[in-house]
Structures are given as C-alpha cells and as structure tokens.
C-alpha cells in the first residue's frame, strides 16, 4: 500500500480489525478458495451511442427534479465534508463542488451528465475486454422482456442452474 492511499489504508485497517489478518493475507486466502460458481457475464449495450447519452441526461434531470440538490445541500449543512468517500460519488461530487464554489447548480448538473457519460464509456470498455461476455444489443428502446429471455437462454445454454 502506498502511504498516500488513504482509502486503501483505511480498508486494510478495517479488514485487520475485523479478521485479525493483514489485507495481503486476506486476499491470498480468498484467492485460494475454489470458485463454487462459474461466472456468466451478460452485458447490455445500445448500438446508437447518442441515444444512451440522451438516457443518461434524462436520468440526471430526473435526479435533479427529485431533489438531489437539496440532498447534497443538506449533507453539507450537516457538516459532511465534500472529501468524504460517499460525497465522491458521481452527482454528489459535482453538485457539492458547484455549491461550495458558488457556481450555478445547473453547471454542476451538466458536469454530472458529463461524468456519467464518461463512466458509462469506461464501463463499456471494461466489459468489451471480457472476451467471454455475452452481449445483448439494443437499437434504441430497451426491450427488457427480450433481454430477460435472452439472458435466461444464455444461462441454460451455459449449463448453469
């Protein structure tokens, strides 16, 4: 562990306090346990990327309409520092920064949209690297019923129960 990696140091101390083992021992022992289940990765993708971005934008607008700004303001008013791990989540971090610097909250919301799109892109890239992932592709509107049927078919075809 790097001495400046506060989050991992805290996690290592939590593991030691809970188990009496160092994080290295815990990780080594965890890897030595044989997997009881074979993983089956099912990934969902929209072929039309701009449509995914529109869905993300609509979701952020919905979160704002449901009171995300008030929630962030409330947490800050309670003295929760903006550097707290929970306040680093997408949405909280950007709105807290806008509020604390006096920028318009609307700018913070636009930044939430940008960060959410960047995160979605990283997720898709991560899944694409998994050569064993089974992809369910949507043109535009998600067809959840078809996705459930496709997923069920993949599970049965893989031999999983």
Enumerate the predicted regions with their spans.
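Catalytic core of IPPT-family isopentenyl/dimethylallyl transferases
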Residues: 32-161
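Phosphate/Mg2+-binding loops and adjacent switch elements
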Residues: 1-39
